[in-house]
Amino acid sequence: KSKIHLLSIIGEIEGHENLSGSTKTTKYEHILPELAKVEDTDEIEGILVLINTVGGDVSCGLALAEMLASLSKPTVSLVIGDSHSIGVPLAVSTDYSFIVPSGTMLVHPVRMSGMLIGTSKTYEYFEMIQDRILSFVSGHSRVSYDRLKELMHNTKMLSKDLGTVLVGENAVEEGLIDEIGGIQDALQKLYDMIERKR
């Protein structure tokens, strides 16, 4: 039997500051060294990523996605609830991705809290961050850069916001996720990929 490492990405992806104790979080500073160890050991042959996240910090979420994408071992992700916001790059960062029929993905423009300086440079900075996300997602899935940007700036779905919610099959049709499936499908796919790599 193959030895699989299980990684859960849940709640909110924590940034460079601790969130409140009542918030369920994924701490990137724990996961990055964990993934480095997984890459460096012969005992682990594949990684299964379970995702149910509302999103969170952009730079930390992208760091996790880049780390997953750069692993040499087979990786499979399974969206079992939500994969919102920066959860989208995480879901597509693996070699193959699944979403359960009721799972959702929310694609929306970059948001920032706190005090902002109202200059063109601030807008350009937002555009740069957004481009990093669009480039990563389109580079690791079947959706084009332009189509993803269109989904991100959709004004017809959310009453007080921009963006698109994709449920299950819609995420597959748009090319974000590879296939509809559950834990059995995800594990079987990972075992098959490991077997082909041996």
Task: Name each model feature, range by range.
Residues 1-88, 92-198:
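N-terminal organellar transit peptides
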